[in-house]
């Protein structure tokens, strides 16, 4: 039972047993053999007893693991004890409004499609189990903030850098040669009580190189729609400039091999109308030199049509998009908390097209509302997304119902179910 895959399956088997029970409740005596059958094991595993602890008292570890899964499902709000009936548990009607963080060791396939899976659990517990080559890791990490958001984070720079490196390390080991890692990081981090910016980003780039051998390909600027900030230093004290962008740090494990994988022709942008007229009129009309001869113009230059404009390393994408609006509607319908930091689908879409081909595996180890998974799904890439907060992954599942092969784990139906039924 030490296999992470078997532990993941055991957790799912326990949840499903209650879903399939006629009255949604089971005694532990009824539950144990059902789980054994679903796991494809011999019933003898329920009889094996081994010494435990200093006293050496003999216990059945398989039954203990099942009870551990029960307790986890209880924390999710999926299971509850039946009052006055010892050892009897029942499927709850709905999870609550608070965020439910996965306990250490919990790994549940919350939902899946033909192309990907969304897993509820800690990425540190799940990434070690990925057993195939990864072409791209694209993830928006919890930001380094003085006051962490509801979804977590740390305020200590050194701890934050170590946190990122530890979360990435198992993925680096599974990255294909020339594969890419793209990390969305804040540019709005300041020294405590001062208007001077933190240099955590620069420290992180160096640490990722020294510790994990990751080379910096680019620091792509994502310019979104931001409220004025930093509020105190820009709006109150009038010292700082308002921040307008976030980092998307693009890294690779092999800059020589990435030449065979990245292709900017997959993300060409439309030419402007003025450029199209310029080309149609024959391009450059006269000879000229600029910058001490470093730039030369010759008649006829830029007169040949091209399929598009090469993208720059500044992405101008507003935060609102149809996919985000759909997620918000789904979360409200299920009466679940809404994620406080979402990016438009265009951002992961851009990097997935640039750095992968159809059929490649894309991983997001801080899945949030599973934006990376949705972008990968639409682009016919395989995907794995891991999210620590139950309510985020549950609400995200609704957007995938139209995808081929969609399956929502039965235990997830109970999360927010009361609101969905009331409003349905």
Predicted regions and their residues:
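Positively charged, polyanion-binding regions of nucleic-acid-associated proteins
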Residues: 2-30
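Nuclease-adjacent, charged terminal/linker segments that flank catalytic cores
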Residues: 2-5, 69, 84
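Core catalytic lobe of class I
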Residues: 30, 41-49, 58-63, 67-69, ...
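Alpha-helical residues within the helix-turn-helix
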Residues: 33
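Residue-level detection of the helix-turn-helix DNA-binding "recognition helix"
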Residues: 36, 71, 398
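Accessory beta->alpha helical hairpin/"wing" motif in late/C-terminal subdomains of nucleic-acid enzymes
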Residues: 81-103
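S-adenosyl-L-methionine
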Residues: 107-127, 401-424
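Nucleotide-sugar donor-binding patch of glycosyltransferase catalytic domains
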Residues: 390-396, 402, 409
């Amino acid at each position: 039972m030490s296999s992470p895959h078997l532990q993941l399956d055991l957790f799912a088997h326990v949840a499903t047993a209650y879903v399939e029970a006629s009255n949604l409740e089971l005694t532990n005596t009824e539950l144990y053999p059902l789980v054994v059958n679903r796991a494809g094991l011999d019933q003898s595993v329920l009889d094996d007893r081994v010494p435990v602890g200093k006293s050496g008292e003999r216990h059945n570890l398989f039954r203990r693991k099942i009870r551990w899964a029960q307790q986890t499902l209880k924390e999710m709000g999926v299971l509850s004890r039946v009052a006055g009936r010892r050892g009897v548990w029942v499927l709850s009607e709905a999870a609550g409004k608070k965020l439910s963080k996965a306990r250490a060791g919990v790994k549940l396939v919350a939902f899946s499609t033909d192309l990907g899976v969304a897993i509820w659990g800690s990425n540190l517990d799940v990434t070690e189990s990925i057993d195939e080559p990864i072409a791209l890791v694209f993830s928006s990490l919890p930001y380094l903030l003085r006051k962490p958001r509801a979804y977590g984070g740390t305020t200590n720079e050194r701890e934050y850098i170590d946190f990122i490196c530890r979360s990435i390390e198992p993925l680096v080991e599974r990255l294909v040669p020339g594969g890419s890692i793209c990390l969305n990081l804040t540019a709005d981090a300041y020294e405590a009580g001062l208007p001077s910016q933190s240099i955590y980003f620069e420290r992180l780039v160096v640490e990722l190189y020294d510790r994990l051998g990751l080379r910096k390909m680019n620091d792509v600027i994502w310019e979104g729609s931001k409220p004025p900030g930093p509020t105190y230093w820009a709006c109150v004290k009038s010292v700082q400039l308002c921040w307008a962008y976030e980092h998307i740090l693009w890294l690779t494990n092999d800059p020589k091999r990435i030449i065979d994988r990245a292709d900017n022709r997959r993300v060409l942008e439309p030419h402007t109308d003025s450029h199209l007229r310029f080309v149609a009129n024959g391009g450059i009309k006269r000879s000229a030199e600029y910058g001490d001869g470093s730039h030369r113009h010759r008649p006829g230059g830029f007169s040949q049509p091209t399929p598009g404009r090469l993208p720059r390393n500044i992405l101008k994408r507003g935060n609102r998009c149809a996919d985000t609006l759909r997620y918000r509607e789904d979360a409200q319908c299920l009466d679940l908390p809404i994620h406080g930091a979402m990016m438009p689908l265009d951002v992961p879409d851009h990097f997935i097209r640039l750095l992968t081909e159809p059929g490649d595996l894309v991983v997001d180890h801080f899945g949030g509302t599973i934006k990376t998974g949705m972008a990968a799904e639409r682009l016919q890439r395989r995907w794995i997304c891991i999210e620590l907060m139950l309510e985020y992954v549950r609400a995200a599942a609704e957007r995938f119902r139209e995808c081929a092969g969609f399956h929502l784990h039965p235990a997830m139906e109970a999360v927010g179910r009361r609101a969905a039924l009331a409003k349905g």
